């Protein structure tokens, strides 16, 4: 997509998280984080250099993006991707926001303590907040009262790269909460709920800087008179669990991680405060953005432009199902390989590799996907229809047998052992 925009006279840039192999292609300018990036004093890669920059990643990405906007060639239209690390693991807030939500008790989801029935893969994952999070690395909990030494923390470099002054302020902000925790002597359900609160408070404090950064960019566009003719898109690459099923992270095809935020602004074209209820995917972004810009959409693009839908000229897309396929196994969180489709009402998933399990949900009757209906006789016609539709979608996307290769038993065994070693002794 950036190549197409550049070939049509646009200035193009990407700033922030890249997390792909190779250098960015099709961009006139790029300044990207190394790998996932670090929250504090991150390393930035440019065409001819890699340098560590003192500061907070979200603020730096915002500032670099504003600098590029101010220095761009104003005679050309532009395409800019601002890609934040936040709120990726391990949710380290800016120093000014560390204690932002200390006085708040966030409501935990009803499913925080789940009862999985006929959901084998959901039961066997390793992404439960109160079982699998590293208390030091993820929750910033200390090893004992009166010390700043962190509890389980297999990746010390996230904190070690802080300057002495940054670490001093960080420890001063977290020490009172950590000491108060050890005084409470929590166990069982109370401890599990406490860990959920720690996670949510850090997560929300981390995204506070994203909110500020987005606001600064929107303010700049308005101040320069660019807001009336600039499509602004706020989105992500997936959803995220904030305690649903007791989980953090993503990966599963269940709704909290399958759905993702998508906010768009283009005054005079997209009706204000309008809401669109159609099934879109991130592969639809490229054809949509190109059509908005009046650029021809290449015939080999698999996505569908939803321009006319967000403009309010159409209510439906030419799509009755969306496809999902998760391959990363054995890997972090040990979410089993699975694929499936979703329609307006139903969802079917097949978990495979070291298991063979189907799940089927009526999202109208069971939006939280608690009741796997795969064996329910009342739904066998719908299940048959969904399996046929799944086959046709896989044919459309040319899904090959190579994508169903199984992991070796040894690799799975080694992964479990490795994660157990990294987990260390939990606070119980």
Predicted regions and their residues:
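Residues forming the ATP-binding cleft of Hanks-type serine/threonine protein kinase domains
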Residues: 364
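Short, charged, surface-exposed hinge/linker loops at domain edges
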Residues: 402-416
């Amino acid at each position: 997509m950036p190549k197409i925009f550049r070939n049509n006279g646009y200035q193009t840039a990407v700033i922030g998280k890249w997390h792909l192999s190779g250098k960015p292609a099709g961009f006139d300018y790029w300044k990207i984080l190394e790998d996932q990036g670090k929250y504090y004093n991150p390393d930035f890669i440019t065409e001819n250099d890699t340098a560590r920059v003192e500061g907070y990643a979200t603020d730096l990405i915002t500032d670099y993006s504003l600098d590029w906007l101010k220095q761009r060639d104003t005679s050309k239209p532009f395409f800019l991707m601002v890609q934040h690390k936040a709120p990726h693991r391990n949710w380290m807030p800016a120093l000014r926001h560390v204690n932002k939500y200390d006085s708040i008790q966030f409501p935990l989801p009803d499913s925080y303590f789940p009862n999985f029935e006929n959901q084998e893969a959901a039961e066997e994952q390793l992404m439960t907040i109160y079982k699998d999070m590293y208390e030091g690395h993820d929750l910033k909990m200390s090893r004992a009262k009166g010390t700043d030494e962190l509890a389980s923390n297999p990746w010390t470099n996230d904190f070690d790269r802080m300057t002495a002054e940054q670490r001093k302020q960080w420890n001063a902000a977290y020490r009172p909460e950590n000491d108060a925790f050890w005084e409470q002597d929590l166990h069982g359900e109370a401890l599990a709920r406490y860990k959920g609160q720690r996670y949510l408070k850090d997560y929300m404090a981390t995204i506070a800087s994203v909110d500020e950064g987005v606001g600064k960019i929107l303010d700049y566009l308005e101040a320069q008179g660019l807001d009336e003719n600039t499509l602004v898109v706020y989105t992500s690459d997936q959803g995220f669990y904030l305690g649903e099923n007791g989980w953090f992270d993503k990966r599963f095809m269940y709704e909290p991680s399958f759905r993702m935020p998508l906010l768009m602004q283009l005054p005079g074209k997209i009706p204000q405060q309008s809401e669109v209820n159609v099934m879109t995917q991130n592969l639809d972004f490229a054809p949509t953005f190109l059509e908005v810009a009046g650029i021809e959409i290449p015939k080999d693009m698999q996505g569908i432009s939803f321009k006319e839908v967000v403009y309010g000229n159409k209510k439906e897309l030419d799509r009755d199902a969306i496809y999902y396929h998760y391959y990363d196994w054995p890997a972090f969180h040990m979410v089993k390989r699975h694929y499936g489709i979703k329609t307006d009402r139903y969802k079917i998933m097949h978990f495979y590799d070291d298991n063979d399990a189907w799940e089927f949900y009526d999202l109208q009757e069971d939006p939280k996907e608690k009741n796997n209906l795969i064996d329910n006789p009342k739904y066998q016609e719908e299940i048959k229809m969904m399996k046929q539709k799944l086959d046709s979608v896989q044919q459309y996307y040319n899904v090959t047998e190579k994508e169903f290769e199984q992991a070796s038993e040894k690799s799975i065994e080694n992964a479990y052992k490795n994660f157990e070693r990294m987990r260390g002794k939990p606070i119980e």
